[in-house]
Amino acid sequence: MKRIGIGFVLSAVALASLLSLSLSGCKGREKYVNVDRKKFPDEVMYEAARAKDTDHDTKLSQAEIESATSILIEGAKDLKGLDVFTNLESITIRDGENMKYDFKHFTNLRSLSIEGTWSSNRIDLSGNTKLEKIKITSKNLQELVLPEGAPLKEFTLSRSLLKGIDLSSYKGLQKVHIETNDNMNELDFSDFPELVDLTVSANKILYTLNVSNCPKLTTLDVNYNNLANLNISGCSNIEKLTCAWNKNLTSLDVAAFTKLTVLECDKNKIAALDLSHCPELTRLVCYENCLTSLDLSYTPKLKELYCTDNDLTELDVSCCPEITNLSCCRCSLSTLNFAGCDKITSLVCYDNKLTSLDITHCAGMRWLLCSGNNLTTLDISKCPKLVDLMKTADRDEKKEGRVKYEDGDIRMLEFDKDIEVIK
């Protein structure tokens, strides 16, 4: 009986030891994730995991996994193993190739940035309800499922094949960029009360855009589309508006934009531009339109004006004493008045019909191109930078009938060969 008792005790001890060893192994498997090629077969993913192994023991502890709240992956082809990092709040994937992944595991995700091709042509973010920032650049993306009720503040979509995008449920959006999506022909961003920055550019068949009633909007960029209709009523706080290269745009109403400082509307078919309510304007780019007149008497802070290639016959910038750069070539101008504009450093007015040009009050002038006019004399004696240029730079007569002196991009002077230059 005694021996039987001892054997029983020994057997119990052995069993307990085995159980202890077995439980320890389970605990270890639960607590650690090996950083190896089996778990992370892609080289880029493997290196990303190694970067999270802070104690360099080739394992990821629970603490290391939980502390990984952001990850950057560049050039991966396989995202296998990413789901190990369950606490991620920010994921950035760049230069990915033929990727496919389900992001539903990341319930804490707040920021997602994807750049690359997506093999499934579909990205489903319906489970990521905490997302605040989404940026997707994927040239073969045809379907995007957004999370309902997510507190989105920033959204960027570029180079996709989507035919449209509906963001009307996300009224908290502050910044939206929709660029180079060739299948979109109409977009509506009306009634976004928090929207501050909107870029909708280089969408080559985009014909209609509604941006009305966005009271906080300050920056609007709609360059390089095919717009014929642009509704920006109810956006009275716009400070910067760029709508260049929309070849079907024939009108532009900026009367409500009293805070406007920058207006770039070049390469359109705009016939008239009323700036009488834009006293803060400092930069105006309106070249290659159909303007027959341009009233600048209400823009005293204007510093830069580029109105080349319009149908202007006269131009008066004398009400703009702050102007430094003026380009008005190829406009059929017979009159150009910039009296009192003593701060001008660059004047480009070639190929017009000017018979006189007085720059004696422009002591800082360093860039003057005035060839192709009807000038007989040119007095540069009060412009020391131009006088010095003629003394130090080589004379270039390669362009027939014209003389040019050039000092890199610093100074330039060009005039007709047969005029008298007073220096």
Model regions: which residues?
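Conserved hydrophobic beta-strand positions in leucine-rich repeat
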Residues: 69-71, 91-93, 112-114, 134-136, ...
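Ankyrin-repeat and related helical/solenoid repeat scaffolds used for protein-protein interactions
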Residues: 340-341, 346-398
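Canonical leucine-rich repeat
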Residues: 79-82, 99-103, 121-125, 134, ...
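Tyrosine-centered aromatic motifs in long, intrinsically disordered, low-complexity repeat arrays
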Residues: 85, 106, 128, 149, ...
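Intrinsically disordered low-complexity segments with strong compositional bias
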Residues: 166, 188, 194, 210, ...
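Consensus "Asn ladder" position of solenoid repeat domains
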Residues: 139, 160, 181, 203, ...
